[in-house]
From Swiss-Prot:
Molecular function, one GO term: pseudouridine synthase activity
Known role: Formation of pseudouridine at positions 38, 39 and 40 in the anticodon stem and loop of transfer RNAs.
A Pfam short name: PseudoU_synth_1
Keyword presence, Isomerase: yes
Protein name: tRNA pseudouridine synthase A
Positions contributing to substrate binding: Y111
Coiled coil: none
GN (gene name): truA
Highest taxon listed in the record's lineage: Archaea
Its EC number(s): 5.4.99.12
Length: 267
């Protein structure tokens, strides 16, 4: 039996997703609780895997981990796990095939970036956004790791206008390190008149002098991962606990935003 958990988390509370010694990570928090409850013995023995290794500061509304429970699979449900987890919430669980891998089975991933509207030229942003769709060399828009192919295919980039802010949605099967955050910053530069569509086209063909720097990680969230044929089931008490925790964070953030908003109005 193999189980998969859909997890959400507040990225500002962690040094990234992937476990590493001496710092608090999302994987580390989940593994600690699974071991505490006797569901797994170790990540290696129980084939613990994650879908997306989000960077420090990046949040998720839909990431996935999978493992083979040693015993007590009945405890691996949102109600129980969310009672023990901190800054991570289990929103659903699914029993999956033995060969399931959360990264390789993903059909596509959708990221969202939340961007305060600085008076952007939205038509220029959308023109630039359309250039990223398709198969391109993203060397200028990524922090390249040795041996990794810079060619990636992006399925969709949308600029969605909200009241006072924008949501940038980027969808594709796989992404390079910092790729989404650098795409977002390119769109921001286009919206401010600091970057032209022709320059973006050249950069996507591999012609560039300087790379686009990444936007801050705090605005990015892994919004969705599509797994055909797999449904994650939650439970009422577990979801209620998650909603309560997330509302507390929303309330604190809104209070701080209102405070600094009045500062700006006064000065």
């Amino acid at each position: 039996m193999k189980l998969a958990l859909r997890v959400a988390y507040d990225g500002s509370a962690f040094y990234g997703f992937q476990r590493q010694p001496g710092v608090r990570t999302v994987e580390g928090e989940i593994i600690k609780v699974l071991q505490k409850l006797g569901i797994i013995e170790s990540p290696e023995k129980n084939d613990f895997k994650g879908a997306s290794r989000t960077d420090r500061g990046v949040s998720a509304f839909f990431n996935v981990v999978s493992f083979v429970p040693s015993e007590r699979p009945d405890l691996a449900r949102p109600e129980v796990l969310n009672h023990h987890l901190s800054d991570v919430w289990v929103l659903g669980i699914a029993e999956v095939p033995d060969d399931f891998h959360p990264r390789f089975w993903a059909k596509f991933k959708t990221y969202r970036y939340y961007l305060v509207n600085e008076g952007f030229d939205l038509s220029a942003m959308r023109e630039c956004a359309s250039l990223f769709v398709g198969r391109h060399d993203f060397s200028a828009f990524a922090k390249l790791e040795p041996g990794r192919d810079p060619i990636r295919e992006v399925e969709r980039v949308e600029v969605i206008e909200r009241q006072g802010y924008l949501v940038i949605e980027v969808q594709g099967k796989s992404f390079l390190w910092e790729m989404v955050r650098r795409i977002v910053n390119a769109l921001r530069f286009c919206g401010l008149g600091l970057l032209e569509a022709e320059e973006v086209e050249r950069m996507l063909s591999g012609e560039y002098g300087k790379k686009i720097p990444p936007a801050p990680p705090e605005g990015l969230v892994l919004w969705h991962i599509e797994y055909p044929g797999i449904g994650f089931e939650g439970d009422e008490k577990g979801i209620k606990k998650a909603r309560r925790d997330i509302f507390e964070r929303y309330s604190r953030a809104l209070t701080r935003a209102a405070l600094f908003g009045d500062f700006l109005l006064e000065y």
